[in-house]
């Protein structure tokens, strides 16, 4: 099978760096230099960047799915994507639903601790 009119992909050596002379002769069709990994380390950094971007997307996707099925412990309603959520001992609440168990007053913003009597 011949690739007429198409350039072959470059083979990157595994155990040594590409000589500078070879890099200077590699140009794209528009006259700019081709972006190729020069060493294993550079390839590794590129792989890490792609992996991190994939992980960030996957984490956001999973968080969106988790919030879609999460419900408030008090009102049993769902959560909006940009809504503030209070997590107390693994139970999720809307900010306005998280109230004192004795007087049912909302807490001012900040950290809270349970007092055991």
UniProtKB/Swiss-Prot annotation:
Keywords, ordered alphabetically: Cytoplasm, LIM domain, Metal-binding, Zinc
InterPro entries the UniProt entry points to: PINCH-1-4-like (IPR017351), Znf_LIM (IPR001781)
Top-level taxon in the UniProt lineage: Eukaryota
UniProt xrefs under SUPFAM superfamilies: Glucocorticoid receptor-like (DNA-binding domain)
Subcellular location: Cytoplasm
Residues in LIM zinc-binding domain copies: 70-117
One Gene Ontology molecular-function label: metal ion binding
Tissue distribution of the protein: Detected in testis.
GO CC terms of this entry: cytoplasm
Listed name of the protein: LIM and senescent cell antigen-like-containing domain protein 3
Organism of provenance: Homo sapiens
């Amino acid at each position: 099978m011949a690739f007429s009119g198409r350039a072959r992909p470059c083979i990157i050596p595994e155990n040594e760096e590409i000589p500078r002379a070879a890099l200077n002769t590699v140009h794209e069709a528009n006259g700019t230099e081709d972006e190729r990994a020069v060493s294993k380390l550079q390839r590794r950094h590129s792989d890490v960047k792609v992996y991190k971007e994939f992980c960030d997307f996957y984490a956001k996707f999973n968080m969106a799915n988790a919030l879609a099925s999460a419900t408030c412990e008090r009102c049993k309603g769902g959560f909006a994507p940009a809504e503030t959520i209070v997590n107390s001992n693994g139970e999720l609440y809307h900010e306005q639903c998280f109230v004192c168990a004795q007087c049912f007053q909302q807490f001012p913003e900040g950290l809270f601790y349970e007092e055991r009597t």
